[in-house]
Amino acid sequence: MINYKYDFIPAGDQGIHIVFPEQIDISENQIIQELAHQIQSEFNYEITDVVPAYRTLTINFDIRKTTYYEFCLKLKNFLSHYVSDKKHNQGRTFEIPVCYDSEFGIDLEDVAAFGNLSVKELIKLHSKNNYFIYMMGFLPGFTFMGNVPDQIAMPRLSVPRSSIAPGSVAIAGKQAGMYPVDSPGGWRILGRTPITLYTPSRPLPPFQAGDWVKFYQIDRAEYSAIKELDAHGEYQLKIISG
């Protein structure tokens, strides 16, 4: 039984959006992540893709095997008998090294001023938090995470930058993220991780929606050393739970 209200909305002629309450909520999103796995398993023959997001679950089905109305009835029946698997909700926690050097953290001063903090205090606050991955998207391997502490939840730039370096660690309001490739972007950049977040030769990132990220501070020497190891495939991401 699901304790959240939800609606079904058509997504083209071969898709369904299951839409949950409009909020950024970890418990709600964990239900969405779990449903994605269970629906993928239960209806594997009829569906082609399942895409979880902040508050929606999009299911694409094979129109040769079912119709929108038939599949809606099946989903309603499935959801009415849904039982949570708490083990799946736990996720894994990854430790991500971040260099907060001023060359990398180009918005550190502004975000510190926004939060009435010193840069040192900002780094401590940012790195002590655990960030939940709500969804992957926008770019291959881009992590949409929350929840950024209110004190430093500075809105995104009014005018996006034309280029953000790969590995940039950023915030935008209550959201946190890591840029996997060079890209335009309007989020506030606090630092940079030396690890490769996406490469075409390894298209699947090590973490996924439902996991957690814990940042920890490194200096420039450590950044260079880890980057060298990572370039040769010798750096192992630390998983501290899950």
Give residue spans per PLM region.
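Glycine-rich active-site loops that engage anionic ligands at enzyme catalytic sites
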Residues: 1-242
